């Protein structure tokens, strides 16, 4: 059964969102989500639904309810920023989810994929953030909100007026979503490899790094929801192999447990 992606173009109708330099947020984000949908449905085995595909208004709670009712696998809300003196790109997850959570790791995948596409324009990376935003709080699936430049910054508004730039923004969104959901490509394409054996004959150890939470979860199966126990910084475990789960890598340990393979949280050394 195909995965379902819910794309939410911010604002719409009576709510223009941010507006400056002759453009409105509601119009730009609608262009972006339509491009993302086109890329995803043309390249991957996936279903994509939009909160809106025209200039109409939906309350914030209704956006989340529609996605929840459809049982979407991933919710991505697309916005343009505005604040005096602001510039750059950032993403948000719900404030009560940590960077090391499943949602946090999926946020990182999406964030990195988008920034990889737009950094050639000299865009500032403002980082992965967390906030108590309605569409993130009320959705029942992993949800990420992207803020794609500042409409009130003259230079960034000039980019937002260029279709070529919006194409890159859309490509980044699509590539990140495809990686998160491990989407299978159409026309002979194949899904990413599920497992990779360690490259050398030496024993590899994964060591937990310091992080703001002061711990990491280990899991009793290859599932980000299968939390088993917390482990502390400097604890080390023997790696059996690497697996990909919903677009993010895990190490399967010799003990049979699993831990994130994200270099932000762990380091690997040969023994």
Curated annotation (Swiss-Prot):
Cellular component, GO, one term: viral procapsid
GO molecular function annotations of the record: N-acetylmuramoyl-L-alanine amidase activity
Entry keyword set: Antimicrobial, Bacteriolytic enzyme, Cytolysis, Host cell lysis by virus, Host cytoplasm, Hydrolase, Viral release from host cell
Source taxonomy: Viruses, Duplodnaviria, Heunggongvirae, Uroviricota, Caudoviricetes
Species of origin: Bacillus phage SPP1
Keyword Ion transport part of the UniProt annotation: no
Enzyme class: hydrolase
Main location: host cell
EC number: 3.5.1.-
Family annotation (Pfam families): Amidase_3, DUF5776
Name of this chain's protein: Endolysin
GO biological process, one term: defense response to bacterium
Domain MurNAc-LAA: 5-178
Its biological purpose: Endolysin that degrades host peptidoglycans and participates with the holin protein(s) in the sequential events which lead to the programmed host cell lysis releasing the mature viral particles. Once the holin(s) has permeabilized the host cell membrane, the endolysin can reach the periplasm and break down the peptidoglycan layer.
Localization per Swiss-Prot or TrEMBL: Host cytoplasm
